[in-house]
């Protein structure tokens, strides 16, 4: 892409990545005239980021490609408080030691998306707001920062108003103070790093505006804010979650196979929008792909492209290759081609599992695994050639598992029909 022929704001609009923006014309003018420093904050609520964090991370990446310097703020301080924005209830307060451990793990994850290696101006950096929030005294904070905030305005912000209307408990002073802390973060980064733009999800609009106002009150300078749409699925369920799991970026929490499958199962209504959000594929190429998929009677290619692009980005070429291999062999029945590590991924979170003891019959295993509801149904499906043990159809209704059924002396894969699987782990 030729950066001289398009500005970063235009690019983000083309990819539907802007929800709100302040002082747009002035910001575009500055972005075209010089390199700026911008930041986005991530509060650690676990030891891993999840796929909901991908949009702001990739947005930071786009700004860096255009020659701007991204700062990733990890909320070691604000993460101890909890952001009440559009949350129904008070967050659990975590120990300082726990939050700091989470931050160390998250540092590696964010390094996958922005470049820390360049010595030029656009080199990214990571900061931890615990470093400055923990060193300012309460009296100093209230006198120097608190005096600029009107409680009347704060309780009328949508994020707080909805919380106050939701339940009888309302909001604690701890979480109510979060808005001041995030505003102070912007002020600190403006003073010490010359940050003039904060980006975040659309739920952060109120916090970002407060930071802009605080900087103007203290320094009489103009800064900017930009938010991206919060992703929801077409059925209004929360993006980034399945019925059982949050889709994490850490392979130990969400295996590359499950990560890949999540994107493969993206609906036709969502997939082209997600290609704009999560890949660098040109928008014209995405629109062409959409037309081609609609003209074909076969399965759309968009989901495969999306899954490949994002899995490669997060888990590398080897992670993608493994996810594709497991997918291919699992659904073609070539179980003998799966390695022990492949089975470990399936056991981690890939398919349902059931622990069983030696001597159990196939009928019992099918019931225990919930692949069938009764032994009668089990006998019927076995007789009709619908049950596979590892790679082989099993027609014996009274079949008892033997040692050769145990792959790597631990696993046996049951399949009902073509799509329903369960992994036996032998005790």
From Swiss-Prot:
PANTHER family: TYROSINE--TRNA LIGASE, MITOCHONDRIAL (PTHR11766:SF0), TYROSYL-TRNA SYNTHETASE (PTHR11766). Its EC number is 6.1.1.1. It comes from Blochmanniella pennsylvanica (strain BPEN). GO terms for cellular component: cytosol. L-tyrosine binds at residues 39, 178, 182. Catalyzes the attachment of tyrosine to tRNA(Tyr) in a two-step reaction: tyrosine is first activated by ATP to form Tyr-AMP and then transferred to the acceptor end of tRNA(Tyr). Residues 360-417 form the S4 RNA-binding domain. This is Tyrosine--tRNA ligase. A motif ('KMSKS' region) lies at residues 238-242. It is found in: Cytoplasm. Belongs to the class-I aminoacyl-tRNA synthetase family. TyrS type 1 subfamily. The keyword Ribonucleoprotein does not apply. GO terms for molecular function: ATP binding; RNA binding; tyrosine-tRNA ligase activity. It catalyses: tRNA(Tyr) + L-tyrosine + ATP = L-tyrosyl-tRNA(Tyr) + AMP + diphosphate + H(+). A motif ('HIGH' region) lies at residues 44-53. It is an enzyme of class 6 (ligase). Gene3D superfamilies: HUPs, RNA-binding S4 domain, Tyrosyl-Transfer RNA Synthetase. Pfam families: SYY_C-terminal, tRNA-synt_1b. ATP binds at residue 241. SMART domains: S4. The lineage of its organism: Bacteria, Pseudomonadati, Pseudomonadota, Gammaproteobacteria, Enterobacterales. Homodimer. It comes from the Bacteria. GO terms for biological process: tyrosyl-tRNA aminoacylation. Keywords: Aminoacyl-tRNA synthetase, ATP-binding, Cytoplasm, Ligase, Nucleotide-binding, Protein biosynthesis, RNA-binding.
């Amino acid at each position: 892409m030729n950066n001289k022929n398009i500005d970063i704001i235009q690019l983000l609009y083309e990819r539907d990545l802007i929800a709100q923006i302040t002082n747009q014309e002035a910001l575009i003018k500055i972005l075209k005239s010089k390199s700026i420093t911008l930041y986005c904050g991530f509060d650690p609520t676990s030891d891993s980021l999840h796929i909901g964090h991908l949009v702001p991370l990739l947005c930071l990446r786009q700004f860096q490609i255009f020659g701007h310097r991204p700062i990733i703020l990890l909320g070691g301080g604000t993460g101890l408080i909890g952001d009440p924005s559009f949350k129904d209830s008070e967050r659990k307060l975590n120990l300082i030691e726990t939050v700091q451990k989470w931050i160390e793990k998250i540092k590696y994850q964010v390094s996958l998306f922005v470049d820390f290696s360049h010595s030029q101006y656009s080199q990214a950096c990571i900061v931890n707001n615990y470093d400055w929030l923990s060193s300012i005294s309460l009296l100093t904070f209230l006198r120097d920062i608190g005096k600029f905030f009107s409680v009347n305005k704060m309780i009328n912000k949508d994020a707080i108003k909805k919380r106050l209307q939701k339940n009888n408990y309302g909001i604690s002073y701890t979480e109510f103070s979060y808005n001041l802390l995030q505003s102070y973060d912007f002020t600190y980064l403006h003073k010490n790093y010359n940050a003039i733009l904060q980006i975040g999800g659309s739920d952060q609009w109120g916090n970002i505006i407060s930071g802009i106002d605080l900087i103007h009150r203290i320094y009489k300078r103009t800064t900017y804010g930009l938010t991206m749409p919060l992703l929801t699925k077409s059925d209004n369920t929360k993006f980034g979650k399945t019925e059982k799991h949050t889709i994490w970026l850490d392979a130990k929490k969400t295996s590359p196979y499950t990560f890949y499958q999540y994107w493969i199962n993206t609906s036709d209504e969502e997939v082209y929008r997600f290609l704009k959000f999560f890949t660098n594929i040109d928008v014209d190429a995405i629109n062409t792909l959409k037309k081609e998929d609609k003209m074909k009677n076969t399965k759309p290619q968009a989901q495969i492209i999306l899954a490949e692009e994002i899995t490669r980005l997060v888990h590398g070429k080897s992670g993608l290759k493994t996810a594709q291999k497991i997918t291919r062999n699992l659904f073609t029945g070539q179980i003998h081609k799966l390695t022990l590590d492949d089975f470990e991924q399936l056991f981690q979170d890939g398919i349902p599992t059931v622990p069983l003891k030696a001597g159990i019959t196939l009928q019992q295993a099918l019931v225990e695994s919930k692949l069938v509801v009764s032994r009668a149904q089990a006998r019927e499906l076995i007789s009709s050639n619908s049950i596979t043990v590892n790679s082989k159809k099993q027609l014996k209704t009274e079949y008892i598992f033997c040692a050769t059924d145990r792959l790597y002396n631990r696993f046996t894969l049951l399949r009902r029909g073509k799509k329903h699987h369960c992994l036996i782990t032998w005790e």
